[in-house]
Amino acid sequence: REAAVAVGARKTVLIDQPIAAVMGLGLKLDRMQGVLIVDIGGGSTKISVVSRHGVVNSHFSTESGMLMDEAIMNVILEKYHIRIGRKAAETLKMALGVEWDLNRDTRICEVCGISTITELPVKIAVTGEIVAQALNPILYRIFSGITSVIQMTPPAILGDIREHGIVLIGGVAQLKGLKELVLKVTDMKAHVADHPS
């Protein structure tokens, strides 16, 4: 608030983050009953239904992009005895995404790490299957939160959400396969905001 006044604002009003997100996305709530926003950021996930009257319901969790990176680092260490850094884990997460098909998945991504056996640098080719194994428990908890919010949403608003889709924002929103997975789990289409971060 002080920062806004310092740069010349005459009046400041604090608003809930989900409402700010709706405004920032340019969504017109006067034309619809409500919108479901899933904000998966680096440090937390916030799932909110916002209507023209404010936040209808929401769910907050610590599931995040950072936890996903740590899960990938742990799976690589456990399976290959190789330590990789957070940047390498994020590269794997964004390159390979969340979905893989056991019969067709040939996507791989190479990253460098340190062998815990030889303590020497090594390069490793990681498949989408390995990344999915790391991300699945976190995604399960995120989708449990989405399901919980959907179940608490009034039918009139839910009809609008079904028609317009779920809006994905935050750094993890661009994860390959995420919007397709949202559709599979919720039976509602999802789209990534133009500027999700």
Please report, for each region that a protein language model flagged, where it lies by residue:
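Nucleotide/phosphate-binding catalytic cleft detector across ATP-hydrolyzing
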Residues: 1-40, 48-166, 173-196
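Conserved Rossmann-like nucleotide-cofactor binding loop
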Residues: 43
